Amino acid sequence: MSEEKEDRSNYSADNIQVLEGLEAVRKRPAMYIGDIGIKGLHHLVYEVVDNSIDEALAGHCSDIQVAILKDNSIRVIDNGRGIPTDMHHKEKRSALEVVMTVLHAGGKFDKDTYKVSGGLHGVGVSCVNALSIALKAEVHRDGKLFVQEYSQGKPLYPVKEVGTSNLRGTTITFKPDAEIFNISTEYKFDTLAARLRELAYLNKGIKLSLTDERETNEDGTFPVEHFHSEGGLKEFVKYLDGTREPIIPEPIYLDGTKAGIPVELAMQYNSTYTENVHSYVNNINTIEGGTHVAGFRRGLTRTLKAYAEKSGMLKNLKMEISGDDFREGLTAVISVKVQEPQFEGQTKTKLGNNEVIGAVDQAVGEILNNYLEENPKEARLIVQKVILAATARHAARKARELVQRKNVLTGTGLPGKLSDCSESDPAVCELYLVEGDSAGGTAKQGRNRAYQAILPLKGKILNVEKAMEYKIYENDEIKNIFTAMGVSVGTVDDNKALNVIKLRYHKIIIMTDADIDGSHITTLILTFFFRYMKELIESGYIYIATPPLYLVKKGKDQEYAWTEDQRDTAVQRLKGAGKEESVNIQRYKGLGEMNAEQLWSTTMNPETRTLRQVTIENAAECDHTFSMLMGDEVAPRRAFIEKNAKYARIDV
């Protein structure tokens, strides 16, 4: 037995299995990494880090260091076993070269080497190599240092031994190819940090770090963030609920194996009114859910309902309790490890393995039942929360039906404030949500009436983070947004999901003033969309307009500027031979300061405007951020605004 175990842990060229070649990657990169925009650019880093995480899951790696270098290259260092460098018998070349140049070649396909492995697309580091203008692989293994360099996936020379080493592990340094990633090759520190933080919680005990070598601190050191969690998902839930008021003092936590499937989960009830369940399979964020989420919901509903009925707390309740009621105000993270995951859904992020339902259901039932029996005070608070949720759900349904019934009773049912467009094809129609009646009037004059609709919003809309659902549908501004769009709540599969079949516009554009109030209104609207119309964000329908901050004029010449750098450049350009005093700078504090023609040419004309599409890069991080921004605690919100808002020190 011990000899067999020894053979299986002997990681060498024989463990590297080859499935197909690299030829198509550069031709159709989006097929392999999702897209060639900002998301795909960051996905390259995740693919390399996933290799190191696989080593950690196999028990051979404890430290992963990621760095953004000065030229936006990426370096990933781990202390794993190091990619094998010996001769691959079938390929007749070094196993390192095979791993780096052949798609779907690697130890993750050999179940004796890795029991489970991560990576959504599973294309591995060879795909990163193919899409990099330069990549260098360094392997510390067996007391030696091996190196090979590549360009666009092709080796520049055979693997060579360049010296001795008392270290072990792999270092991958790569620079994305600007020909492929022609939108941007600039990495976002916060985006990478969010994923590494997530991985630290999902893989407790592993140390990860992210260094930004593009800038320096006052003491000359590089900014660095460290990620390490000994508590795993328990700490993850505490992080997500950091600015929410918990109903129970500590998250309910389980880490075990059911039916041969490792299941880790943590859950906590809080005083909010939304359900926040985040699920993972082999470290992949399954944003569409799947069988593990179905098992969790089934186990939660079954166990809580049985306890509530046994306690007698439901005997005077005159309404039926639904599964949704048991999850209101619940934050939970579920992580399962599956040897052969089957992914379904539009984005291939929905787990389809049926055997997982029962495993998670059983795990949730056991841990929750024990908790309820051992903590009667907390159990009572949870059941009271469920009863309150059921009452509120009935009120919300009535309020929602009132909004939706308007369409039937009043013909179109469109808000009186809406200036609609003449085109009826949603694919070409745009809806501008504009801050204030004044700017709304200017936008109505400046728009293209054929395909641009304008809906002015009066002041700040309701903060949905703090409101019960029925209050949301009673709010006039939200009712106007809801009815203008033509959407309804409830689908065949989910009675709380947004039904977008009758959506009237495929571009919904938030247009607010370029000041703190404008940012606040934008955030309130985005919070509403994220919590109650997330499908619109996921479908790519939500955008933010970017009106200019400055108008720089000299005589009849003028230029608009969106940043201070652009303003200064425009001043220098217009100054020319004249005096600087002759250049006039106007700072736009509100949309109403522009006339209709200016608003059209800078912010609404598809030929000249800049729209920022709203995407969800990391659902858990978005959940945490909205909770922090819209919650009651001032300190974390102020820190976030000072770090991220361009206007943090002006126009307050």
What are these regions (language model features)?
Residues M1-N15, L22, L44-Y46, D54-A56, ...:
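GHKL-family ATPase ATP-binding module
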Residues K27-Y46:
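Conserved short strand/loop->alpha-helix "switch" segment adjacent to the catalytic nucleotide/phosphoryl-transfer site
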Residues D54-E55, G82-I83, I516-D517:
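Residues immediately C-terminal
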Residues G82-M87, E91:
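A short glycine-centered beta->alpha linker in the GHKL/HATPase_c
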Residues T391-T410, D425-E430, G441, Q445-R447, ...:
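C-terminal interaction appendages of subunits in large macromolecular complexes
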